[in-house]
């Protein structure tokens, strides 16, 4: 049995409905739904307030789907109750970000500013001009958008300029050493 898949998913304060392979979860932070693979069976145990995922057999693919389905449901419950948040910081002279409507504009050393449309279900806030906070109930969407923002200008290894996750450690490489007297002598 899958070690992750066999654990029930505690619902807590979320409202859950299961019908025909579609799981809908609603909470204070929003609503999410997941179409479950036809081989997986999801049951709502309303007495214990938990979701239980079962699989038909011990086939390799079903074992993998078992743990995956349970993890996705757990992330959905956590997201609609508490939400997810990723923070990024911009480092570099003149590097900054700005939000206009549903667009995040990054000025990070290119000739033109980079405009990224903010997906629905994701809230983006700024702290100053160099800190970006991405939040929302969908863990995959929050992580993907934060990754897209970072991908615009990854931290470079010599000075560390670029967009990085808050607290991310960037290894700085040493530059070229001064040649000294070796190059000019004959």
Residue ranges and their predicted role:
Residues 2-66, 70-147, 151-186:
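N-terminal intrinsically disordered, cationic/polar leader segments
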